[in-house]
């Protein structure tokens, strides 16, 4: 379920910004296997596809059905497929354009990407402890 973060009135925030909602992508096979995926472009699995449909319904209800007076809605996502699929599940039925942006991409974990977290803890115990 998306977390709604309402912005307090702040001179640094433009008047027209009503809310910013951050939504994590749906589950992937790597998530289910507890593998560190980082910037490897792993697609959503069946559970992840179901999750994004449910999240899209909740977002539509929260931000469109209950607040039809807000004219501008902007959907920004990572350029990775799992994030784009999540964004499109909400945006496409509403005719909203999705703006992929590499600046919101998952961070890189370098050589750790694709390795199960449990294996990382065993192979690199000191590094893993400082990271986790």
Residues covered by each model-derived region:
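Extreme N-terminal starter segment of soluble prokaryotic enzymes
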Residues: 14-21, 73-74
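Non-catalytic terminal regions with compositionally biased, polar/charged low complexity
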Residues: 2-16
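Active-site-proximal alpha-helix that buttresses catalytic centers in soluble enzyme cores
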Residues: 2-5, 24, 29-94, 123
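Structural motif
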Residues: 12-15, 67, 99
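Residue-level recognition of specific faces of alpha-helices
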Residues: 19-22, 32, 130
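Phosphate-handling substructures
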Residues: 93-132
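General small-molecule cofactor/ligand-binding pocket signal
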Residues: 21, 76, 99-101
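Short, positively charged
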Residues: 20-25, 111
């Amino acid at each position: 379920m998306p977390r709604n973060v309402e912005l307090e009135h702040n001179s640094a925030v433009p008047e027209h910004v009503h809310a910013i909602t951050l939504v994590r992508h749906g589950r992937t096979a790597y998530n289910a296997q507890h593998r560190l995926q980082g910037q490897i472009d792993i697609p959503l699995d069946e559970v992840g596809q179901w999750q994004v449909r449910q999240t899209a319904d909740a977002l539509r209800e929260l931000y469109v059905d209950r607040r039809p007076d807000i004219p501008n809605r902007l959907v920004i996502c990572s350029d990775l497929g799992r994030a784009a699929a999540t964004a499109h599940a909400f945006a496409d039925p509403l005719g909203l354009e999705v703006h992929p942006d590499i600046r919101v991409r998952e961070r890189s974990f370098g050589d750790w990407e694709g390795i199960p977290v449990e294996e990382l803890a065993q192979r690199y115990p000191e590094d893993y402890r400082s990271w986790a």
